[in-house]
Amino acid sequence: MDKLGCKKKIIILARRIKWRINQCRYHLRFVNKKCMVAPGSSISRDLVAGAYSWIGPGSIIYPRVQIGKLALLANNVTIVGGDHNYRHAGVPMVFSGRDELKPTIIGDDVWIGAQSIIMTGVSIGNGAIVAAGSVVTKDVKPYSIVGGVPARFIKMRFNEYEIEQHEQMLKQPDSYFKQFEYLLLSGKDRS
């Protein structure tokens, strides 16, 4: 076996060991074994996440969140909600309870920049990019780039032809992406 082949095998083994540690740490039953969760995150046990997704250190993820495959959540991304019920006159908010959490859907191949806040109940379409430090309060269309407080449309990531090509790639089975797996940890480890 050549040096590169050996290095790839070591990298893949390191990923598997990290996954087992994360699985024990966060009790993640619905997260694909090829999804990586960095240490220092607060993750709801009902998180659903696809293969090759990355959740950066210091992230906070409330219940009822679904993350697609190949998604990147940078450091300190927060997905929050559960607003206090403030509509009961004569009752302090601390005793008024909370509204029911709405599901939050993050599509495939989405990149959410560092320090961004995503409010629960939002849907972020496939291939979208959320700029660092943004606050997302409304749905984000597929392949759009948004940023700001609150997040607003900046531009499209791809043209129509490129979107069609990219969608075809995203339809590939997880086994297709195995050829790129060693790139996830090669060079500098992200955690």
Question: What positions do the PLM features span?
Answer:
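Residues that flank catalytic or metal-binding motifs in active/ligand-binding sites
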Residues: 75, 132, 142
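Flexible, glycine/small-residue-enriched loop-and-beta-strand segment within the central core
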Residues: 21, 41-49, 54-122, 149, ...
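Beta-rich strand-turn-strand
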Residues: 114-129, 134-138
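Short arginine-rich
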Residues: 139-143, 173
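Conserved sequence/active-site signature of Rossmann-fold short-chain dehydrogenase/reductase
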Residues: 78-79, 135, 145
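Extracellular beta-strand-rich, repetitive "passenger/adhesive" scaffolds
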Residues: 34-37, 55
